[in-house]
Regions:
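Domain-level signal for soluble alpha/beta catalytic cores
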Residues: 1-279
Length: 279
């Protein structure tokens, strides 16, 4: 079964406000609410709190904006499951993986804000296995009940630790911000030999030069990093060979409401999604 999650919220908000999403969270909540509803209307069963960039290494008063992003999703918990975004402390693709006191305190404070207000923790794009291991430990010290999903970049560094990721106390292991062909090849090479079919598997599609954007760290130019989509024609062979009962597909940078709607319709037309999974 294929289940859908939302697409890139920052990518959508950035079309209107060229910041990290903090202006919309504080001054235009309706824009965010409408985007969430659009994803749900498409057929998405999971949405994600929009706090990926709300952290002390990015903005002041990060916790204020996290609280506001949490408040916005609460009414939707009657309609779908909410992923609580647990962002990377260090910039993506950086080589810094030091577990400092500031690192620990950020995650302690963040998890205390998320606890009880989300359905699943989504640990996104940390730069190393060491960081993910520490984040999961902090979560479990504070909240021993709510499931954890880890979402990693499909890069060389993470390829060395797929088995170790599966040994963490997590509910699922996803791949983040990746073209379909790259995801498929990475899965076959690194996931498949050690996969735990009891865990949830998923991935985020993208239409962006993710590494170039991440290295630039210029959110005001996010839209300029979008690339032309490549038509995919080999979904069927990949999905039919997966050992999982459920696969979650979402969108990341360059992959918003329009792109998710197109993907859902395409997979439905290919017979890969049952009609009752969609609105």
């Amino acid at each position: 079964m294929i289940t859908f999650m939302d697409g890139g919220m920052l990518f959508e908000l950035n079309k209107v406000y060229t910041d990290y999403g903090e202006y919309a969270v504080e001054n235009n909540k309706q824009l965010i609410i409408d985007l969430y509803q659009s994803y749900i209307d498409i057929g998405c069963k999971y949405i994600t709190t929009c706090n990926y960039c709300f952290k002390p290494t990015k903005i002041k008063q990060w916790d204020k904006y996290v609280k506001k992003s949490i408040d916005i999703v609460q009414p939707f918990r009657q309609k779908c499951k909410v992923f609580g975004c647990v962002p990377p402390y260090y910039d993506s693709y950086s080589n810094n993986n030091n577990i400092t006191e500031e690192f620990v305190m950020y995650y302690v404070d963040l998890i205390n804000l998320l606890k009880g207000n989300i359905d699943i923790y989504l640990v996104e794009t940390a730069t190393s296995f060491i960081e993910v291991e520490q984040i999961c430990r902090i979560i479990r010290d504070i909240d021993n009940d709510t499931p954890i999903i880890v979402s990693i970049y499909p890069n060389e560094n993470n390829s060395k630790y797929i088995k170790e990721y599966y040994e963490l106390p997590i509910y699922g292991l996803f791949m983040n911000c990746v073209p379909f062909d790259t995801m498929k090849d990475y899965y076959s090479k690194y996931f498949k030999p050690v996969v735990n079919k009891k865990m949830l598997f998923g991935f985020y599609c993208n239409y962006i030069n993710e590494k170039a954007y991440a290295l630039s760290q210029d959110v005001s130019k996010l839209q300029s990093f979008k690339i032309l989509p490549k038509k995919e024609n080999n979904y069927e062979d990949f999905f039919k060979d997966l050992p999982f009962n459920d696969v979650v597909i979402g969108g990341c940078c360059g992959y918003g409401v329009k792109e998710m709607r197109s993907l859902v319709n395409e997979l439905k037309n290919k017979g890969l999604v049952s009609g009752d999974s969609l609105k």
